[in-house]
Amino acid sequence: MYRGLFLISEAVISRIEKKVLSGGKILFAEACDLALHCARADLDRLLALARQVGSLHHGKSIDLCSIVNARSGRCSEDCKFCAQSSHYSTGVDSYALVDPDYVLALAKQNEAYGVSRFSLVTAGRAVSPAFLREVASIYRRLGEETSLAPCASMGLLEPETAEMLVEMGVRRYHCNLETSASFFSEVCTSHTWQDKVATIEHARRAGLEVCSGGIIGLGESMEQRIELAFELRDLEVLSIPLNILNPIANTPFADLPALTEREILITFALFRLINPRAIVRTAGGRNLLAGQQKKLFLAGANGAIVGDYLTTSGDGLKKDIDMFLNLGFSIGSREK
């Protein structure tokens, strides 16, 4: 249980620091204790520890990816945060397939700025083999005309569709768990958390790398965020995008209170400590921190989705790159 505000001793903090800096695994109870403690004190110390752990495993490289909304709107699922769900009247644009020439132009623009990965993202519960045959030519052109690593985020997978993606040249599949298993039913009822895990397993068995993270600020507790971080560790996910809820009008989560900056920074730092070898990737919502978003990278983040997101705007590519360089990052990743 999340036990309220309290402070832990210097000896306990020092023991946790020594453990994680020597390659040991932080325990769930230790992460919860740090979250409780840092809600009142020693936030800078936690952030410094997260940076040290990140540097230990990843140096000063930052892994950049970008996405394109390849199929928008009319989604059958009822995720309560999502502008693309057909259950809510959000006014989002709807289209069956984005113009391939636009995709290639966007990909090349991103590549010119040092982005290393590019993903097609589709609205909907899943994609059919027929749809994948439609987008195969886009992936072929990406492979022929760019050096970007091609990724996909297309909902729930079956073994057949996972294998088709591999045959098309896709290297990495993204499927967010969204939130912890204990909170998922509060976020979505049209599919289950276990459906997400099955998709991750199908992708991995087919030979795809896996990218999976979630959204914070959905009404979950700090303890449930920590649960998610440990669930991702158990699944051995090595690319973890963390979104900060950007409330969409007319969705059930439109009026949820915003997280405080302190809560956000504690969350990012703990994800880094719990998943030291993963790329902890900032995603949608980081621009809500405005001029303070650089603090996410001082809290251990070492990856980012750059450019615009699916139905909300990001920061411009050049602005992002300038921020990363000013923070001392080199563009590109040591991720294997």
UniProtKB/Swiss-Prot annotation:
Top-level enzyme category: transferase
Cofactor note: Binds 1 [4Fe-4S] cluster. The cluster is coordinated with 3 cysteines and an exchangeable S-adenosyl-L-methionine. Binds 1 [2Fe-2S] cluster. The cluster is coordinated with 3 cysteines and 1 arginine.
PROSITE patterns documented for this protein: RADICAL_SAM
Record-listed [2Fe-2S] cluster binding positions: 119, 151, 211, 281
GO molecular function: 2 iron, 2 sulfur cluster binding; 4 iron, 4 sulfur cluster binding; biotin synthase activity; iron ion binding
Pathway: Cofactor biosynthesis; biotin biosynthesis; biotin from 7,8-diaminononanoate: step 2/2
Chemical reaction(s) catalysed: (4R,5S)-dethiobiotin + (sulfur carrier)-SH + 2 reduced [2Fe-2S]-[ferredoxin] + 2 S-adenosyl-L-methionine = (sulfur carrier)-H + biotin + 2 5'-deoxyadenosine + 2 L-methionine + 2 oxidized [2Fe-2S]-[ferredoxin]
Annotated InterPro entries: Aldolase_TIM, BATS_dom, Biotin_synth/BioAB, Biotin_synthase, Elp3/MiaA/NifB-like_rSAM, rSAM
Pfam families: BATS (PF06968), Radical_SAM (PF04055)
Positions of [4Fe-4S] cluster binding: 75, 79, 82
Entry EC number(s): 2.8.1.6
Alphabetical UniProt keywords: 2Fe-2S, 4Fe-4S, Biotin biosynthesis, Iron, Iron-sulfur, Metal-binding, S-adenosyl-L-methionine, Transferase
Domain Radical SAM core residues, every copy: 57-286
Source superkingdom: Bacteria
GO biological processes: biotin biosynthetic process
Cofactor(s) it depends on: [4Fe-4S] cluster; [2Fe-2S] cluster
Function: Catalyzes the conversion of dethiobiotin (DTB) to biotin by the insertion of a sulfur atom into dethiobiotin via a radical-based mechanism.
Family membership noted in the UniProt record: Belongs to the radical SAM superfamily. Biotin synthase family.
NCBIfam families according to UniProt: bioB (TIGR00433)
Subunit structure: Homodimer.
Name of the featured protein: Biotin synthase
Organism taxonomic ancestry: Bacteria, Pseudomonadati, Thermodesulfobacteriota, Desulfobulbia, Desulfobulbales
